[in-house]
Amino acid sequence: MISAEEALYQSCYCEENVYKLIEKIDDKNGIFAIIISNDCKMIPLWKQKAAKSINGHVLWDYHVIAIEKEKNGSKVYDLDSTLEWSCDFLEYWEKTMNLAEMAQRDTKFRRKFRVIPGENYISLLSSDRSHMLSKNGVYLKPPPEWPLINSHKPSNLMELIRMSEQIENTTVMDEPELFQLFSK
């Protein structure tokens, strides 16, 4: 795996950051892109750089991370996290998902996860960045300097975020299912 310093990063473009990370990895076996969202597009995540306080959370409409599944456990790669790069999955899960706090929240905030094998994510994701444009056609946040992702195909980011969508080579999981997959 590459270091955090080698990873390309642009704030508020997590789907592209993960794409660029996976793209740089020669052996994509065991690497997964994980899209986190829910029906109301409001997912609380803790230990995020965008949080207004140390113990606070961010309410994203979606977030994308990479997970590397290994024999001795899994590692999480989240460039927006305040946790270390290549964080142990169990630590990331405990501190970022914060299930104790989530138990006190409305069920509409429960997160779902679209799990996509790394190789599939590289060929599947297509983004024209239109979701980051204001009504006036101005970017809400500065776009990455690299070219659009798979711009020869129609943009499909919004479909990938909708957890009700059936998309080939992807699996939608709830919190217990994702935990079971990567906690071993």
From Swiss-Prot:
Its EC number is 3.5.1.122. GO terms for molecular function: protein-N-terminal asparagine amidohydrolase activity; protein-N-terminal glutamine amidohydrolase activity. Pfam families: Nt_Gln_amidase. The active site is at residues 14, 63, 78. It catalyses: N-terminal L-glutaminyl-[protein] + H2O = N-terminal L-glutamyl-[protein] + NH4(+). InterPro entries: N_Gln_amidohydro_ab_roll_sf, NTAQ1, Prot_N_Gln_amidohydro_ab_roll. It is an enzyme of class 3 (hydrolase). One of its GO terms (cellular component) is nucleus. It comes from the Eukaryota. Mediates the side-chain deamidation of N-terminal glutamine residues to glutamate, an important step in N-end rule pathway of protein degradation. Conversion of the resulting N-terminal glutamine to glutamate renders the protein susceptible to arginylation, polyubiquitination and degradation as specified by the N-end rule. Does not act on substrates with internal or C-terminal glutamine and does not act on non-glutamine residues in any position. Belongs to the NTAQ1 family. This is Protein N-terminal glutamine amidohydrolase. The lineage of its organism: Eukaryota, Metazoa, Ecdysozoa, Nematoda, Chromadorea.
